Amino acid sequence: VALGGSRCVPQWRNTMESAGIELGYMTPPLLAFPFVGTFRGSCAVGLAPKPGAYHVDHFRCEFAAFREGLFSTDFLGYTEVQGEYELPALIMTAGEDAFDALSAYSEWLYREGGCRRIERTQVPRWWLGPFFCGWGEQGYHSPTNVYAGANQKAYAAMSERLDAFGLKPSAIIVDDKWQRRYGELLPDPVKWPDMRAFVEAEHAKGRRVLLWLKAWDNEGLSSEECVKCLCTPYGADPTSPTYRRRIQETMRRLLSAEPGCFNCDGFKIDFANCMPLGRNLATHERNVYGIELLKRLMTLFYESAKAVKPDCLINNSCCHPYFAEVTDQCRLHDYNGQLRSLWEVREFRARLFKTAFPGISVDTDDPHSTSHAEMMNYLRRAPDLGVPDLYQLHRRIRDEDLREIAGIWEAYSARLEKSVDSKGGKR
């Protein structure tokens, strides 16, 4: 049995799960299949391209007639060969169980595969939360258009409600759509007449401000800044010099404390899986495709942001050692609230993230579920999984729930402060 698949959830929960690792919520995921069988422990078979050569978007394993045990990927015509070419390696690693075998795969990539290991023992205290994200609450403030709820007045009201219930997040996340245009990545002046004033007010309360960032979207971008499919703009192109200059200047505007800038503190990067994929794509730098193109985008965001504010937080859902150097924190990502296995699925994802990035902090994300009991169970247990994250302050969250969550957060923060003091971590 291989633990993997396109949606990165346990194989046993999906009877028709394809044996393919693709770019889903975890983008990219670990490109390895750990097998268990009659033998002891687990053996993983993984793809290991060299740095700069991740021009792929999937890794498949086929167990059909005449193709049993076939591992494959596809370069889709984006790899040009003049002379000799070395295919990405297939490596085999072993462990006591599936996760142990995946850990060995990750370790090989750090040790032999050119991936950069990041020391994560001392990070800024505020990176570890708790967090409040306004996405769920935007729908309360604007029931007919959740995006309209991403405005300064609504977020100021959210901040006041946090205060009223003694909820003390280390950061507040301004979610989709604070931007006027997704690709431009600048505040909508109608929704946010003075974002700097909001940020400074949150700073005065001891909170940082993170901005939700939609990757790839070309809204507001020129054709020159885009990946094209048969001459049609298809998404932001991180190899375009014009787009690169835009992002570098935009990061300065969003993060700098200089006059005329917004002094925000980092980004929650979403929609990485909605990247341009398939044949006939054209980038400014020829033949950069798939995971390699995503690495270029994440590197552009990360390096441009850190050049302005070194302690800013970059939160994303990458889950592969090749992305360790552009990832400060992992987010467990969306869950189908119509299902009833929230903890099981999120715990599984957290183990995968920590397998790819040893020591990383994990944003436990939205506790969305159709069941109030399951939602509260998740919020109570979230500190055992990672950084607690709250998305709602009304509707299914009751006043007594908020008071309970305030107590959970207080206990979590006290444990964290004690740990930081004993380890000498950053504040």
Language-model segments: what does each one mean?
Residues 219-245, 249, 295-424:
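Glycan-recognition surfaces
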Residues 1-170, 208, 266:
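Carbohydrate-recognition beta-sandwich/jelly-roll modules
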Residues 131-153, 178-193, 229-248, 279-294, ...:
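The substrate-binding groove and active-site-proximal loops of carbohydrate-active enzymes
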Residues 181-184, 219-222, 275-279, 323-325:
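Extracytoplasmic/secreted cell-surface and envelope-processing proteins
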Residues 108-133, 165, 173, 194-232, ...:
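Glycine-rich, aromatic-flanked loop segments that form ligand/cofactor-binding clefts
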